């Protein structure tokens, strides 16, 4: 069994493997590329040059739910990007968080999307952020 690699050390091969596993989860069938596999790896390599790995991982989850192909994903990446202010926290909570962390994240999203957050809302946002950052260490 290969040793699990931390996401910050992911290469294009790791991202392709993650794409394939997420595609199976969401589409109930394996991803079959219509192109030579090296082009898919090149697509992920190009994305890694411009985006944070956690931003890419979040976008992969969105794209595989819709059954997108990798070349379309790369060409229209902005359509799949969640534009999260904290992509690392969001991905870690969604991937590894327990019910408590997930509820905190949903509360964070709820408060952060309010048009006119009160002072207590902003304070609660910083408390949630601190707690999740402490958990993510």
Model regions: which residues?
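Short, cationic/aromatic linear interface patches
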Residues: 43-131
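Long, charged low-complexity interaction segments
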Residues: 1-50, 54
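Intrinsically disordered, low-complexity segments enriched in glycine/proline and serine/threonine
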Residues: 25, 130-134
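Short intrinsically disordered terminal tails
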Residues: 1, 133-137
């Amino acid at each position: 069994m290969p040793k699990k690699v931390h996401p910050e050390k992911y290469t294009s091969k790791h991202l392709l493997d993650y794409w394939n596993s997420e595609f199976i989860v969401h589409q109930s069938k394996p991803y079959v590329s219509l192109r030579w596999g090296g082009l898919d790896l090149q697509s992920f390599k190009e994305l890694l040059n411009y985006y944070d790995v956690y931003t890419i991982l979040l976008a992969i989850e969105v794209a595989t739910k819709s059954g997108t192909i990798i070349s379309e994903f790369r060409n229209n990446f902005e359509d799949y990007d969640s534009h999260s202010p904290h992509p690392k926290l969001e991905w870690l909570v969604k991937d590894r968080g327990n019910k408590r962390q997930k509820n905190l994240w949903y509360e964070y999203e709820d408060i952060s999307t309010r048009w006119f957050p009160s002072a207590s809302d902003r304070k609660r946002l910083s408390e949630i952020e601190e707690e999740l950052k402490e958990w993510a260490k």
